[in-house]
């Protein structure tokens, strides 16, 4: 009985995710950039790691090392097609301290964002040099959350620009409403509404249809809608967005309300180069 229990515990330990040592969590914008561009997302566990020789790593810049990785698929999070239980890929990693190759070990867990390799069912290609992420349950939860929103019936569209903006003063001093129309990749109507009332904190909301709900709250940080806005809106309102004939006061009010939205959204937080 004791031998059976020990064997059971060892098997359970082997199957459990092996989280990497504590490391800074991948920022939401960086994770979203990768997740939205990758046809394949998976939690893998390495079974073999081989550093390739220089002649096998053509095009790899100085200070970067290329590795061949074989890995078991622990969990297939997203894929356009089934994958075998074991896959392989190559990853390019920067040198570690003193210019030495970074240490990759067998049995390490990673999240990978990749694409299938045509004609090679067991091979995938990382969509970016930084598309192998150290595994943690928090990282996986963030990845799954982004993909869940992206695959919903009506995900927030990609923002491609800013259209016209309009400002209407209210009947009371300090009362006004500004509406800023956004351009999107699929043509869906998206607009920002900013309301000001005397003695109240200015409020703004975003509408993903032609119906504007003035009572709606701004998007929560680290959501797909927040990402679409915070990482796509330009730092200042384009001149052509101000209507012809707008007074200097109305133009200034529109710009101030646009700045209010940007300040509320905060920085995008992207730190990784986009592929």
Residues covered by each model-derived region:
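Sec-dependent N-terminal signal peptides
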Residues: 3-13
